[in-house]
């Protein structure tokens, strides 16, 4: 089973993608994880990508396509792709690769939330500067404000988590996703999921659909 999952900043798509990975034994491919790993390595490419993210801009398609397709070549089948494609140019690159290798996408899941909810979820996020633990000032606050429960490190807000940057990211996402949504609708594999509510509530909107697809595919 091959899945695409996308959603605006703060939609919880990565959390749901990991649940899907565990339940169906898929390989998890996260564009965000791949990009962050490159940035953390402080490579020239990583430093270049960091500049785009700090401004709330999208990383150029040529860079993202190279990173993702390279990962996909090592996986081949039974994957869930988190956060890719996000532009029409990325769709073209992905479709060309899939066509050349005889791979089909079973479903494209879109987890939708409003801009207000996106800002609320993202702007409250805090990251430990030492160990990388993630907190939220509203949903998962540390015991001592500004300090990590695990290692005592200072909690910081990532530059791209600032409210004004989140709003910009949301607007860019929605603008770029419109033609992508239409593309997958025409293919008959697009499914829109309400991303508001708890993690479990959203999961129960996704699980029955994927159980059906998985069981149907297994009987082929």
UniProtKB/Swiss-Prot annotation:
Keyword check for Kinase: yes
Keywords annotated in UniProt: ATP-binding, Cytoplasm, Kinase, Metal-binding, Nucleotide biosynthesis, Nucleotide-binding, Transferase, Zinc
Pathway: Purine metabolism; AMP biosynthesis via salvage pathway; AMP from ADP: step 1/1
The organism's place on the tree of life at top rank: Archaea
Chain sites annotated for binding ATP: 10-15, 125, 134-135, 197
Catalytic activity from the UniProt record: AMP + ATP = 2 ADP
Chain positions recorded as Zn(2+) binding sites: 128, 131, 148, 151
Listed EC numbers: 2.7.4.3
Molecular function, one GO term: adenylate kinase activity
Family matches, as PROSITE patterns: ADENYLATE_KINASE (PS00113)
Region of interest (NMP), ranges: 30-59
Enzyme superclass (EC): transferase
NCBIfam families tied to this protein: adk (TIGR01351), PRK00279.2-5 (NF001387)
Quaternary data: Monomer.
Recorded domain comment: Consists of three domains, a large central CORE domain and two small peripheral domains, NMPbind and LID, which undergo movements during catalysis. The LID domain closes over the site of phosphoryl transfer upon ATP binding. Assembling and dissambling the active center during each catalytic cycle provides an effective means to prevent ATP hydrolysis. Some bacteria have evolved a zinc-coordinating structure that stabilizes the LID domain.
Function: Catalyzes the reversible transfer of the terminal phosphate group between ATP and AMP. Plays an important role in cellular energy homeostasis and in adenine nucleotide metabolism.
Record family assignment: Belongs to the adenylate kinase family.
The protein, known as: Adenylate kinase
Organism: Pyrococcus horikoshii (strain ATCC 700860 / DSM 12428 / JCM 9974 / NBRC 100139 / OT-3)
């Amino acid at each position: 089973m091959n899945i695409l999952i996308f959603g605006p900043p703060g939609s919880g798509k990565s959390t749901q993608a990991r649940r899907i990975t565990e339940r169906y034994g898929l390989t998890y491919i996260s564009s965000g994880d791949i990009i962050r790993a490159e940035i953390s390595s402080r490579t020239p490419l990583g430093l270049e990508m960091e500049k785009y993210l700090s401004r709330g801009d999208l990383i150029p398609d040529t860079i993202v396509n190279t990173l993702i397709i390279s990962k996909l070549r090592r996986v081949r089948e039974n994957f869930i792709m988190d956060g890719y494609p996000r532009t029409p140019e990325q769709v073209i690159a992905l479709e060309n690769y899939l066509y050349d290798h005889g791979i089909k996408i079973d479903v494209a899941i879109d987890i939708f939330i409003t801009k207000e909810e996106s800002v609320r979820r993202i702007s409250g996020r805090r990251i430990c500067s030492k160990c990388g633990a993630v907190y939220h000032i509203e949903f998962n606050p540390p015991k001592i404000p500004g300090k990590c429960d695990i290692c005592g490190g200072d909690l910081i807000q990532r530059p791209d988590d600032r409210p004004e940057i989140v709003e910009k990211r949301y607007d860019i996402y929605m603008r770029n996703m419109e033609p992508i949504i239409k593309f997958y609708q025409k293919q008959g594999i697009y499914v829109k999921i309400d991303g508001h509510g708890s993690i479990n509530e959203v999961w129960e909107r996704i699980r029955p659909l994927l159980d059906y697809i998985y069981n149907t595919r297994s009987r082929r």
